[in-house]
Structures are given as C-alpha cells and as structure tokens.
Amino acid sequence: MPFRFVLQNQWPTLAWLAQGNKSDRTVTVHHGAGVEVTSDWFCEAVWDGDFQSGDFDQTDIVAGSGGRIRDGRITFVASGSTVDRIQWFEDADSIYVANSICCLMAFTGAVVDPTYASFISDANSVIEGLDRYKPSVQTSRGEINLVYFNNLIWDEMGCRVEPKPGLGRDFSLFEKYRAFMQQSMATVMTNIGDNARRFSLKAMGTLSSGYDSTTIAVLAQQYGLEEAITFHRARGGEDDSGASAAKILGLRMHNIDRDAWRQRVCPEAPFIASYSSGEDIIFLGADRHLHGKVLLTGYHGDKVWDKLTTYLSDKIVRGDPSGLALTEYRLHPGFINCAVPFWGTRQIRDIHAISNSQVMKPWDVPGNYSRPICRRIAEEAGLPRESFGMKKKAVTVAGWDVFHEGGNFLTPSSQEDFLEWIGQHRAAWLKHGRLPPIPSIKVNFLVNGFFMLSSEIKRWIASKTPLWHVLGDPSYRQHYLNLYLFPWALDRMKRCYAR
C-alpha cells in the first residue's frame, strides 16, 4: 500500500488529494508545493510530537491534515478541532480523500445542485457536535462525506471514521490543566520549528483585547512566539487592539485593517467555498503575513474557558462556526489554523469544574464575561488585570449575512459575478419546476423583506412571543439570494484545481 506522489504546482500550496485504487491498494497523492511528503506519510500539519516520527495519527493535539501508512492501513488525519476537516468520496474503483472540498469536487467532476437552499443550515450544523452535524454533501456523483476532528481509516474492510486518542487526562486541578497546556504548547512549538521540515514554518499569534488570544499568546511566548497580528477595530468600530499585551510580552505586532478585504477583487469566494459561514474573511487583509505560518487562534475559547458556559458535551458543541471559513482560504497563502482551545476540549466538564472551583475565585471577575483560567494564566505572567478581558467584543463579520454589513450584498466585483452566475443557471430551477431567483439586488431586497416578515409572523403566532421581539431578532433575517452563495463560490474556486 505505498504512496505515489504527484506534485501539482498550480494548486494552492497546502492542498492535497489522495486517490486510493481499490484493486491494487496503491494510493496516489496529488499535492501542492508546500505539502511535506515521505515514503509512508505526508502532511501539512503540526502536532505535539517529533516531526520526523510522523506520529500525527496518534494524537488529538494536531492542526492541519495528512495521511499515514501504519500496520497495513492508511489513516487520514483531520485537524483536532472543528475549524477544519477532511472530506472523502468513494466510487466503484477508488476512494478519494482531500483537505479541500473544492479540490475533491473538481477532481471527481462532482457538482452540487445550485437550487438547493439549505447549504447554510447544513454547513452550520457542525456547531451542534460531532454526533449531530450533517455528515455529507449531496452531489451529482453521490455523497461527499465530511470528517471533523476524527480520523478516517482505509484498510481491507473499507473506509470508516475512528475517534482520535487523547481522552482520560487528569484535569482535576488548575495546575494540572495548565501543565498540560504548557507541555502541549512546548512540543507543538518545537514541531513547528523542526529543521527537518522541507518547508519551514513559524508561529504567528492573534491578539485582541479579549481573553482567549491573550492566554494563547502568554503560553506561546514562553516557547518562542515572536509576533502576532491584531485587528485594531472590532465589529462596530470599538478598539480591540492587543497592543498592550503585546508590549508586555515583547511581541512584534502587525496591525490589520478589519475591512481591508473589501478592496480586493471577488474576495468572498474562498471563504464561502469552505462550506462555512464566511465570517473569517477579515483574515484576507493579513495575507502578506500568513505564508508559512502556524496561526495560533482562539476559536472555541468562548466555550472551553468561560465560567458560565452550558456547552459541556464531549462531542464539541460550539456557539458559532467561526474559524471554519479559513478551511479553503488558508491553503492558498499557505498557513495552518491551530485553534489552541480545542486541546483537551472533549474533557470540557473537567475544565469547567476548574473555572468554577473555589481556588479560582481570585481570578473570577463580576459579570457574565469571566474566564478565570485565562485570567490566572495571563495575570501570573505579569499582565495587569485591566489590560485584557474587560469587555466582550467580536471582530469577525457576522455569518452568511455579513456581506450586508457595509451596505452591500457583496463587494461590487463579486456581486456582478454572482448575479451573472444566477442568470446562467436559470435552467436548473426550471428543471425542478420552480421559478429561478431574479438576479437583481432590488428584487432580492423586496423578496427578502416579504419572506422575513411572513416567517417571523408565523413564528410569532407559534411562539406567542411579543411581535416586536420577533421582528427585532437579527437571527431570523435570512437573505434570499444568500441561500445560493455556496454553489457559486464552489464553482469559482474549483478553477484553482485544474490538472
């Protein structure tokens, strides 16, 4: 079951697709220029172990993806988080596994139904947990299967998903949890900087005025973190810079304009084509700083470290899908999204017990924005109490509707291209006996208003909630044309995977 590697120089640098031949058990791995390859493993990944050993299949502390031959089987490894994934497809002759849904569909010739209106809810279902998300995307060639957090095994029995190892750690005390985080950070940082890598990597922090990124920067600075990016303005324009913490920690800061992406041509496509909400598009403004980086992010810290969280399932239930929109985009500039709060997250009940223990009271601040574990780690490293975590802010754009944030449906170039695409696919709706959407922003505004009002009145009748509460709830404002953004973005990004 040997690997055969085929370099695809024109592909995004970190993209890969493995095609396994069922008859002779050979596996051909097509890959971009930045993927590490050896005789029995390949990866674009970092993990808590020796790089040359390639044991990323034997840990849950891993970011990125790859494949490993061991004991007569192949383990395809997904990131130990739900801000990334691998996907696979099977036909009569082969299995196909890739770290890009765009790559997989381009390679196999699969297409999605452009008239399907539930991509938004299907994609967001991952926040409900590993046992409740919709595990596949229907295409013209059959189902493409999605694997979050866990690993995919291929052997003589076929393909199956296998849980990652890593449960049963002792998090009975704050000191033990902190020691675990420190040891994990130390080994991951060593792995990042290993000289045996053909393509060198370097850690890059993300700093804001909040808890999560500050905690991660404190942990990583002890083991060589030198720089970080910050978006100096949060959603709504509030100051959210992490400059104060960066100065104390001695980190070099790169200030990023949160709206810089709006100046690009068709910037939204790679983020929406990730099969996600698209809300992490703000990172496009930092692209010149991201090549060859391992981005240490705080995704899921709002649940793992929050004192008041009720999300205590070992199946990794989240509050939002933030971070997932980087899945496709990151392959192009070539960086790895390392979401540190996911380390040990399946034992969130133990972590939550620490946050609420009596011994953590000195680091528990009044109000509903208290993360005692974060505060203790940061304050004991020398950060003043008032320098971080004083007010909860958000820097990402707010989900599939965020492109309305600046008053536009999409940026002008993307809007023009998307409406043209809608017009080109009119026949798909007619084939289903349905009227196609009219490619007009004005009509979209009117139709959206009608559907929003009618659906919210129905909800009001069913819930007996005061009508003004229903009409004021932004979570129910579905935008009509937004329902079809994913197949448009997918079409555009598949062009990056020509052979």
Describe each model-derived feature in a short phrase.
Residues 1-261:
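Cysteine-centered catalytic environments shared across enzyme families
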Residues 2, 12, 114, 135, ...:
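Proline-rich intrinsically disordered, low-complexity coils
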Residues 99-122, 126-129, 365-385, 420, ...:
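Charge-dense polyanion-binding interfaces
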Residues 156, 167-381, 385, 395-408, ...:
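ATP-dependent adenylate-handling active sites, centered on carboxylate activation for C-N bond formation
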Residues 390-394:
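Short, glycine/acidic-rich hinge or "gate" loops at secondary-structure transitions
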Residues 409-447:
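C-terminal catalytic/acceptor-binding lobe
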